[in-house]
Amino acid sequence: MKKVILIADDSPTIRKFVSFSLTMHGFEVVSASDGMEAMEKLPAHKVDLVITDLNMPNLDGFELIKSIRGNEEYKDIPIIILSSLSGSEDVEKGMSYGASSYLVKPFDPKRIHYEVSKYLN
């Protein structure tokens, strides 16, 4: 059975690129354009890992992480932040909210696959 990854990013280009890369490695990918849509999609899919941007409308990545970590059913899902915010305070905040890893855009697709594989293999 394929592992399911939920990608939350307001950029259609990023969602398509990451989805294509992960699909080529045998993962099933579910996409959301913001944190609110991501939270709506969690119950409909057995999500094994979340990749999220931080700057998104409606519900940003920080709030998405807090919502996932605060939900008994989803609290143990690994969460990888993929963001253009590269300051140490952003990394610290993301990790303190419960992120498992933090990757900075622009990114190497091999690095995303490596990070995903750490949690799903």
PLM feature spans:
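Short hydrophobic/Thr-rich beta-strand motif most characteristic of the beta2 strand and flanking loop
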Residues: 26-33, 41
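Active-site beta3 strand of CheY-like receiver
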Residues: 45-51
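Receiver (REC) domain active-site loop signature in two-component systems and cognate sites
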Residues: 56
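C-terminal output helix
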Residues: 107-116
